[in-house]
């Protein structure tokens, strides 16, 4: 496929936080002919911003293309594993591994676990941008009836925070308000969800969560 792309994977993603989402130009290929396996690869060469429909050269910074490949294998309905890699030309290499596992406990009750890990390596340290980073998160959710109770932990390591431009990071504490991705940052989440189908109102749901963080390298982010 060649043309406009709205990529949605752990290493290439678009942002729809505004009325006009950003998009990319490039080419890609996907395949799901093997039962349980989805694979994809692509190269993004141009991008638009959310406040401008015109396109600029380069998927990230000027003249920097982004090449990615990876996929997800579902062993069964309860267990899947994802592996992805990406190269931002003359900028960074990034690798991702993720796993999602649901353990049925009883009728209507299950325990869901999600693990995500990113490793980003600087490809050209001469430009002054530090991007070396390892980011990991673990979330556990108890689903019982129409209720869900979850906790999550996320941690950053390396010489910098997690570098991102647009869209969602596939980490538990990356939310619309903040990604909690500063250098050395550790963050903790508590979450509750309710499905109002339990009150006879299907399609209506409620979610609340609290996230706090610590250990940020304030010298790196420029905070006194």
Predicted regions and their residues:
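Extracellular/periplasmic loop regions
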Residues: 55-56, 112-202, 217
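Outer-membrane beta-barrel domain signature
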Residues: 13-18, 52-62, 70, 84-89, ...
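Transmembrane beta-strand segments that form the barrel wall of outer-membrane beta-barrel proteins
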Residues: 2-14, 39-45, 69, 77-89, ...
């Amino acid at each position: 496929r060649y043309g406009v792309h709205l990529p949605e994977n752990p290493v290439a993603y678009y942002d729809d936080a505004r009325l006009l989402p950003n998009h990319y130009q490039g080419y890609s290929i996907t395949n799901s002919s093997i039962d349980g396996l989805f694979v994809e690869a692509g190269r993004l060469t141009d991008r638009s911003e959310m406040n401008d429909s015109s396109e600029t050269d380069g998927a990230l910074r000027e003249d920097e293309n982004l090449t990615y490949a990876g996929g997800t294998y579902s062993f069964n309905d309860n267990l899947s594993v994802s592996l992805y890699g990406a190269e931002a030309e003359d900028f960074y290499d990034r690798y991702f591994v993720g796993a999602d596992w649901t353990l049925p406990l009883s009728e209507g009750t299950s325990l869901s676990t999600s693990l995500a890990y990113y490793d980003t390596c600087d490809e050209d340290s001469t430009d002054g941008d530090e991007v070396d980073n390892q980011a990991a998160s673990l979330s556990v959710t108890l689903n019982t009836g129409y209720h869900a109770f979850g906790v999550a932990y996320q941690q950053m390591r390396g010489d910098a925070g997690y570098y991102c431009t647009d869209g969602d990071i596939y980490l538990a504490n990356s939310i619309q308000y903040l990604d909690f991705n500063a250098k050395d940052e550790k963050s903790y989440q508590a979450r509750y969800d309710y499905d109002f189908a339990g009150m006879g109102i299907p399609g209506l749901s409620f979610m609340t969560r609290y996230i706090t963080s610590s250990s940020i390298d304030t010298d790196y982010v420029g905070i006194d």
